């Protein structure tokens, strides 16, 4: 499905004991072409948005919060095809920066990623803080654990709706940026309330 094996021996590799959690959050700036960002925003507005849902792995159920829930929709095959090589490029950059290249048997962090889900934040909407233990990715045929989280940002003409980690570590993403971080319990994150405009983004998880 995907190939993240474009590894290079990078002297700036950060897989070292002194690396902090914050150091492992990486942004590829402007990696998505502006015209593709504009096309995605226009294309998604032609289709139905639905309230975001949370998956309960114990009860095997989905549900939305009563207020402030963002809007979501799945990618079409056509948009997925356009975004796939860009996601692979971003993932390869992360791989190169953080993989322990001296390992004889395992030099690749991930092999596949999910279909992109599009997110829309209108004024008053948020993403509640959570961690990316995405049980619903795996149905028995695909086996693994989510390893890396990706957020793709498609516009910057909005206020608020900023990605944050922990209490107040905030990332202001530009148009065409992709931000990545490990999908585990050490990275609680959410999105602040949108104030004006609409923020359009996409998410995918690699394993």
Regions found by a protein language model. Give the residues of each.
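Fe(II)/2-oxoglutarate oxygenase catalytic core
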Residues: 1-178, 186-207
């Amino acid at each position: 499905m995907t190939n993240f094996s474009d590894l290079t021996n990078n002297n700036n590799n950060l897989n070292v004991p002194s690396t902090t959690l914050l150091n492992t959050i990486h942004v590829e700036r402007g990696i998505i072409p502006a015209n593709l960002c504009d096309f995605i925003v226009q294309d998604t507005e032609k289709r139905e948005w639905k309230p975001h849902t949370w998956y309960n792995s114990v009860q095997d159920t989905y549900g939305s919060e009563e207020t402030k829930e963002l809007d979501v929709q799945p990618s079409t095959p056509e948009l997925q095809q356009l975004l796939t090589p860009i996601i692979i490029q971003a993932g390869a950059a992360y791989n190169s920066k953080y993989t322990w290249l001296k390992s004889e048997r395992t030099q690749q962090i991930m092999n596949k990623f999910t279909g992109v889900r599009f997110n829309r934040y209108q004024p008053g909407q948020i993403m509640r803080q959570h961690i990316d233990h995405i049980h619903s990715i795996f149905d028995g045929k695909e086996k693994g654990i989510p390893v890396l989280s990706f957020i793709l940002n498609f516009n910057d003409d909005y206020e608020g709706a900023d990605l944050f980690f922990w209490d107040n570590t905030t990332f202001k993403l530009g148009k065409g940026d992709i931000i990545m971080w490990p999908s585990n319990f050490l990275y609680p994150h959410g999105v602040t309330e949108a104030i004006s405009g609409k923020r359009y983004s996409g998410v995918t998880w690699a394993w």
